[in-house]
């Protein structure tokens, strides 16, 4: 059987990425051009800046991904691309490049939901057994997803306000930490003690919903009041207390979901899945099911995860037309 090569594009936010996947599971290349330095001085992602950066580097990323994979344009079998959710301008750059490549070479175009990409990045660790449950935690999303089979996703719980990664970045900004603040807060948390009593919203409620706005506000108020009084608070203890509250919420809701949906596998993915504290809590407390977390290089936004997610769409022949457009608010359980 002839080998299949999928060229995948990811430009939903501030990472320009192009990857090549051979057949179902051999990731030959995964080129990522980061924009962190450009957005750092703004304390967050500036959509217009992100779009311009994507335009500047997308062609070079395509060339590098093909070269690293050891293939030519003529070897590519199909093109996969993120079409949502994300920043509309950023998404359009990847979509335009992917459609142009596919059209020029007469190849099928595979539409991929960004969050499906995060989830299916776990396929890089080992073949996934369905049904499974997934906890997706990133800067824009916090969701519990039931997956009956590859490509069939159902959101069973999500945040009512802030995403967990968003809360990390806002708290980090208050403390004057460098954007993105997640890794630094995690490191500082391991040096401090959980001494501040931050709220764990909805932790005892009988649902699978999350809320982090109250925790974020409590943190900001404590920090602000201390500044007003001229008091000094331990940054390490603040981070430890904040992270403990976050993890208590995530673990409580995940355990409740596992009780409601008896599965053998839990996938934890998204940028926050790189958090050491989360990985430690999962290892210590989730012992009845197999926990699969993508490697660190596949936790953040990258085209490799889009390539993995595209396989199930390829198998279903779920191809898009040339009118495929960016859908910045695309629902996770919606596919073209």
Curated annotation (Swiss-Prot):
The cofactor remark states:
Binds 1 Fe(2+) ion per subunit.
SUPFAM superfamilies from the xrefs? Actin-like ATPase domain
| Subcellular localization(s) per the UniProt record | Cytoplasm
Q: Which reaction does it catalyse?
A: L-threonylcarbamoyladenylate + adenosine(37) in tRNA = N(6)-L-threonylcarbamoyladenosine(37) in tRNA + AMP + H(+)
Residue sites binding substrate per the record: 136-140, 169, 182, 186, 275
Top-level lineage group: Bacteria
Major enzyme class: transferase
Gene Ontology cellular-component terms for this entry are: cytoplasm
CC cofactor? Fe(2+)
Which Gene3D superfamilies does this chain map to? 3.30.420.40
What EC number is given for this enzyme? Answer: 2.3.1.234
Report the sequence similarity comment from the record: Belongs to the KAE1 / TsaD family.
Q: Which HAMAP family did the record assign?
A: TsaD
Identification of the protein by name? tRNA N6-adenosine threonylcarbamoyltransferase
